[in-house]
Amino acid sequence: MNIALIAHDEKKEDMIQFTTAYTHVLSKHRLFATGTTGMKISNATGLQIHRFQSGPLGGDQQIGAMIANGEMDMIIFFRDPLTAQPHEPDVSALMRLCDVHQIPLVTNIAGAEIFIHGLSRGDLKWREIIKERQEKEGTP
């Protein structure tokens, strides 16, 4: 599965701790992240991560493009709800795209724990089955 990892500045340490704890699960998937978050996770865990621009420079929109193209399966986004973000419209657009395209999105560590356990159990295998069927039928 393709999984995006995003964290606002005040939540980056939480993301590093989370990805360190679940490296054994995340290492089985293709990981994508916004710039600084991806670098910090990779340095801390050794996970291979495709890094986009930082969020304020368009990284959220790059991940959004993957969602719109059917190339993203899950978003783990540790948001900081107590700090105003200069790129908040991009964050809202990303969340909207997840809703439109039925992409699981979690915005805090409690929800991420549920997602990661579901991922390790195979609860999201249905996404891969649908993708394979669409590829055979040639439908988007």
Swiss-Prot record:
> Domain MGS-like spans what residues?
1-140
* Pfam family, any one: MGS
Keywords, comma-separated and alphabetical: Lyase
Domain of life assignment: Bacteria
Question: What is a biological process (GO) this protein takes part in?
Answer: methylglyoxal biosynthetic process
Q: Which residues participate directly in catalysis?
A: 60
Q: Which of this chain's residues are annotated to bind substrate?
A: 8, 12, 34-37, 54-55, 87
Which PROSITE patterns does the UniProt record give? METHYLGLYOXAL_SYNTH, MGS
SUPFAM superfamilies, sorted? Methylglyoxal synthase-like
Known InterPro entries for this protein?
Methylgl_synth (IPR004363), Methylglyoxal_synth_AS (IPR018148), MGS-like_dom (IPR011607), MGS-like_dom_sf (IPR036914)
Q: Name one GO cellular component term.
A: cytosol
Name the reaction it catalyses.
Answer: dihydroxyacetone phosphate = methylglyoxal + phosphate
Q: What is its EC number?
A: 4.2.3.3
**Which one of the record's GO molecular function terms can you name?**
methylglyoxal synthase activity
Q: Which family does it belong to?
A: Belongs to the methylglyoxal synthase family.
Role summary? Catalyzes the formation of methylglyoxal from dihydroxyacetone phosphate.
Q: Which HAMAP family match?
A: Methylglyoxal_synth
Q: What is this protein called?
A: Methylglyoxal synthase
Organism listed in the record: Oceanobacillus iheyensis (strain DSM 14371 / CIP 107618 / JCM 11309 / KCTC 3954 / HTE831)
State which gene encodes it.
mgsA
